[in-house]
Amino acid sequence: GVRLVGSEMCIRDSDYTETVRSTEFYGTVFSSSGVRWVRPDTISTYVPDDGITVASHTYDNKGNPVEEPRQLYDTSFLSVKDKYSMFLGGNQPLGVVKNANNPDGPRLLIIRDSYADSLVPFLTPHFSEIHLLDLRYYKLSIADYIAQNGIDQALVLYSVPNFVTDSNLLWIAK
């Protein structure tokens, strides 16, 4: 999937240096399947985060907005079971990735589950901002969000099992 999208955006493997971060990754499907004889997968990173800032946006118990800095790759998660949270620091209702190296680029909204998180670093060179909404946690108007944040393009990206079963996709129409 990532290579197909990359080929459409003129992203070449030679543009990146692969860094293997973990050779002991078992994902959600492994955890829920009961199949235990498969070998673990590898987690690699490809994109340096120079000029890239990541922030998670949530609300405190009084409804006030709270911004928490994050990273494209948070390697502290490599020492816990949920290694996939290394990408963008795990699940969050709203995340914003800003690219200081492309301030005039378009703004992308990704409506997604965590499946999209590993793709985001490959998209960062092409956008000034990437806004990530997880409809399991984000319940405000998406149309208002698009208008308030000058979104130019949108992408819906889910794993297939989540896409076909997620009842929260109804929030797209709000």
Regions found by a protein language model. Give the residues of each.
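Extended hydrophobic leader/signal-anchor segments used for secretion and membrane insertion
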Residues: 15-18
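Short aromatic-enriched loop/helix-cap "lid" or pocket-rim segments at secondary-structure transitions
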Residues: 167-169
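Single conserved hydrophobic/aromatic residue that forms the stacking wall/gate
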Residues: 1-6, 10-11
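C-terminal soluble interaction/assembly domains
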Residues: 101-160, 171-174
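Membrane/wall-proximal cationic-aromatic binding patches
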Residues: 21-106
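Short glycine-rich, flexible loops that bind phosphorylated cofactors or substrates
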Residues: 163-164
